[in-house]
A protein has these predicted regions:
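Conserved nucleotide-binding/hydrolysis micro-motifs of P-loop NTPases
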Residues: 183-184, 225-229, 246-251
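AAA+/SF3 P-loop NTPase mechanochemical coupling elements
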Residues: 167-172, 206-223
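Conserved AAA+/SF3 P-loop NTPase catalytic/coupling segment centered on the Walker-B
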Residues: 176-197, 230-236
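N-terminal nucleic-acid engagement/recognition segments and initiation subdomains in replication
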Residues: 1-106, 312-324, 335-401
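Conserved alpha/beta core segments of nucleic-acid transaction machinery
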Residues: 272-323
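A short helix-turn-beta junction within AAA+ P-loop NTPase domains corresponding to the substrate/partner-engaging
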Residues: 232-250
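P-loop NTPase catalytic core of nucleic-acid-dependent motor ATPases
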Residues: 67-176, 241, 270
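Conserved catalytic/switch belt of AAA+ P-loop NTPases
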Residues: 190-212
Length: 401
């Protein structure tokens, strides 16, 4: 069917490639703007030979995020980052405030800082936000949908498989990459996620196209019903902010729509709010501020069986003999493990001590006091003096693991 002048489609030329701009219908209503590679000859057939000269031309693509002073074109380069159409306006936002308080709890001000940084400093690196709960109806998905409503097309919902795919052009230039049911419990998944959260540039790859390196500023928000092992997190890891989310007290089916109507007031507040924190790390927040019990639970779940056995054994010795420190060499702990019916090799023990617990032995062979099994004693352990390059671990260190 022929189109009238008012119905003419939009075209652009980027470099030497012609694109048609279309609105692709979404399953749940609305549209998403897409660029489809077009053909010069087809354009001439539809609109005549002179129409091509009127098509806007750009030298290439760029990705420059900005929510306040957005520029669709930067120095003759078409900005792939999309504007958000909210107009900040002073007002109240009680429903948004209640959601942020529910998600961040006692860390409410940190949560507000996180959202403010997303809005005003979109290129700032931020921790991987992981929301966990075994319960249903906790508001985790509502929070993800709220982020999507605020930042619109700059938020993409990924699946676990998307992280493993070599093709990433759909999400590499986004502000937020969110996953509603994350389960990335393979070591290579965890390493990729950590690397993406801190990298400054990334190679974009699409099917049938050459790889292209772009600046990477995406932040990750993950949700999981698995409180113990949604991702692999090692001891000392500072890139995760894990929040345990409680069940909602009520279920309001119109809650998301109420959130959407408050977004202009919320953005106005973020523009004028004073930050509660200052930049203290590459991911803004001091790691100590983000160390939660939910994070410790995941770290403990990631430990191997030998580490757990050593941890429990040494704490048992401390409790039994009434001490807060324990010194030992490899042979001491191996003998104690044998008495506990635990088989272990010296290299396995070394790995736990040096890689997992970050302990270093004494620089020289010195006299130290350790403990060995003695079933004739009430406490089951007796002190013994030995000489060697021993390790020392404290109760505080063990309880922080």
């Amino acid at each position: 069917m022929a189109k009238t002048k008012n119905e003419k489609e939009e075209f652009i030329r980027v470099g030497t490639t012609l694109y048609k701009l279309v609105n692709q219908p979404r399953l749940n209503g609305g549209y998403v703007k897409k660029r489809i590679v077009w053909n010069n000859e087809t354009l001439r057939q539809d609109y005549g030979k002179d129409y091509l000269a009127t098509v806007p031309k750009y030298d290439g693509f760029c990705t420059v995020p900005d929510h306040v002073d957005y520029r669709p074109v930067v120095d003759k380069f078409l900005n792939l980052y999309e504007s958000i159409d909210h107009q900040p306006k002073e007002g109240d936002f009680p429903h948004i405030q209640s959601l942020v308080r529910h998600i961040f709890g006692e860390q409410y001000e940190l949560g507000m800082d996180y959202l403010q940084l997303l809005y005003l400093q979109p290129v700032q690196k931020l921790p991987i936000l992981l929301l966990v709960s075994e319960e249903r109806n906790t508001g985790k998905s509502t929070f993800l949908n709220f982020l999507k409503a605020v930042f619109q097309n700059n938020v993409t919902f990924n699946t676990n498989e998307d992280f493993r795919s070599q093709f990433n052009s759909d999400w590499a230039g986004k502000l937020l990459i969110v996953v509603d049911e994350v389960l990335l419990n393979r070591r290579e998944d965890s390493e990729r996620l950590k690397n993406l959260s801190t990298t400054l540039s990334y190679k974009v790859e699409a099917k049938g196209k050459d790889r292209d390196e772009i600046a990477f500023f995406a932040k990750f928000v993950l949700c999981s019903n698995n409180e113990y092992l949604p991702v692999i997190i090692d001891i000392g890891e500072t890139r995760y902010w894990v929040r345990k989310i409680d069940r909602l007290q009520s279920d309001d089916t119109d809650f998301l729509q109420k959130l959407k109507t408050e977004i202009p007031a919320f953005l106005y507040h973020l523009q004028h709010r004073t930050m509660a924190t200052k930049k203290e790390s590459r991911m803004w927040f001091a790691p100590s501020l983000l160390h939660t019990e939910a994070l410790r639970k995941i770290i403990r779940s990631n430990r191997n069986r030998l580490e757990i056995e050593m941890h429990e054994l040494i704490l048992d010795i401390m409790e039994s003999v009434g001490t807060d420190t324990f010194s030992f060499c490899y042979n001491d702990i191996l003998l104690l493990l044998v008495h506990s019916q635990v088989k272990a090799e010296k290299h396995q023990v070394r790995k736990v001590l040096q890689e997992c617990w970050k302990l270093t032995p004494a620089s020289n062979g010195l006299t130290y006091t350790t403990y060995q099994f003695n079933y004739n004693r009430e406490c089951r352990y007796e002190p013994i003096k030995r000489v060697g390059r021993f390790y020392t671990v404290t109760r505080e260190q063990l309880e922080s693991l």
